[in-house]
Amino acid sequence: MRGIVTIDGPSASGKSSVARRVAAALGVPYLSSGLLYRAAAFLALRAGVDPGDEEGLLALLEGLGVRLLAQAEGNRVLADGEDLTPFLHTPEVDRVVSAVARLPGVRAWVNRRLKEVPPPFVAEGRDMGTAVFPEAAHKFYLTASPEVRAWRRARERPQAYEEVLRDLLRRDERDKAQSAPAPDALVLDTGGMTLDEVVAWVLAHIRR
């Protein structure tokens, strides 16, 4: 496979799991834009930087030399040699990552990190097919109802379903400006599908 595949969608739509599996099947790297935003949010929390302080946050990110290690089996984020990956999927990070991702300077920083990776690769996020890689050869947008997505997320986190659903609905509202399918993307509702079925559907379209 040559070129770029983008897989976008809202939170807990399955895009990360699908992108990882698709990349592995194609034998190409997998890029997680969300992991970079999560790293920025985590570092802001740990350093006591206001998540809305764009200048302070960018100085922190550049000073620590944050970088993404893109691999087919998964991504890692390093900051000054420290692997941040184990700390990035927590309720605390969930609650501030949207505020961080809305900062134009941070979005530009993430996009630069992603564009440092030479194709071919599979990139997942919210606006990979629109803002970051509009030239991608294959574009997909995965979605599902908030209830389905909250149920998926609750299985992964030590949180009650109702709390997860509330957080997810708030994040959907905050992220709606960034999360929309590209005009030429194939849109799939994954609510009634297994992971294997979604991966097979995406691969079938890529291999046509």
From Swiss-Prot:
One of its GO terms (biological process) is pyrimidine nucleotide metabolic process. This is Cytidylate kinase. GO terms for molecular function: ATP binding; CMP kinase activity; dCMP kinase activity. It comes from Thermus thermophilus (strain ATCC BAA-163 / DSM 7039 / HB27). Belongs to the cytidylate kinase family. Type 1 subfamily. It is an enzyme of class 2 (transferase). SUPFAM superfamilies: P-loop containing nucleoside triphosphate hydrolases. The keyword Iron does not apply. The keyword ATP-binding applies.
